[in-house]
């Protein structure tokens, strides 16, 4: 399994100083819940729910940018249909495997709530998983948030239509 290698890689990274816990963000892991649970039985999951009509065009834009570095042609409509189909399959697989996660090891939060109140959502996560949130960590979060205020705003422009999609098509295909 790729996650055996993944675990070894993390162990190499922590050889000098082991962190309290790893926090990894990869939506691509959604389709690998059984493998993750086998490799990391104590894993916790934070499922951030975000409007797919915003995320799919963003992923399409990233894919288009990456492909343009390796190809003279970049069919944006093809990128749109492939991206939508890929994430539809990922989310279907995730939905069928989600019940394998102990409810105490997963929390669902809204992206909008996270943007509006990041510290409150972080506290909710810590509380749900019974993690200690000491004053030093909380102060570090407050400091980081003060320094990065506004950084979450979209930095480039893209639309579903640019990739042969529409908000309605995305919503219909990814409604769970």
Model-based region annotation:
Residues 9, 15-42:
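Flexible, glycine/threonine-enriched loop-and-boundary segments that flank and lead into catalytic domains
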Residues 29-33, 53-56, 115-118:
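Flexible loop/turn segments at secondary-structure boundaries
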Residues 1-17, 22, 59-176:
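PAPS-dependent sulfotransferases, especially Golgi type II membrane carbohydrate sulfotransferases
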Residues 27-28, 50-51, 113, 140:
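Short beta->alpha linker loops
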Residues 25-26, 36-61:
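Conserved phosphate-donor/acceptor-positioning beta-strand/loop module used by diverse small-molecule
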């Amino acid at each position: 399994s790729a996650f055996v290698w993944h675990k070894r890689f993390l162990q190499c990274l922590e050889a000098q100083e082991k962190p309290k816990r790893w926090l990894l963000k990869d939506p691509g892991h959604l389709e690998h819940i059984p493998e993750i649970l086998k490799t990391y039985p104590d894993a916790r999951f934070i499922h951030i729910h975000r409007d797919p009509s915003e995320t799919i065009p963003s992923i399409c834009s990233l894919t288009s940018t990456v492909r343009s570095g390796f190809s003279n042609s970049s069919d944006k409509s093809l990128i749109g249909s492939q991206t939508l189909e890929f994430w539809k399959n990922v989310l279907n697989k995730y939905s069928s495997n989600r019940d394998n996660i102990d409810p105490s090891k997963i929390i669902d939060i809204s992206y909008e709530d996270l943007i509006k109140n990041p510290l409150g959502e972080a506290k909710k996560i810590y509380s749900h998983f019974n993690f200690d949130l000491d004053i030093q960590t909380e102060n570090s979060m407050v400091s980081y948030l003060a320094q990065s205020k506004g950084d979450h705003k979209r930095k480039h422009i893209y639309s579903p239509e640019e990739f042969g999609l529409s908000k309605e098509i995305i919503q219909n295909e990814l409604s769970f």
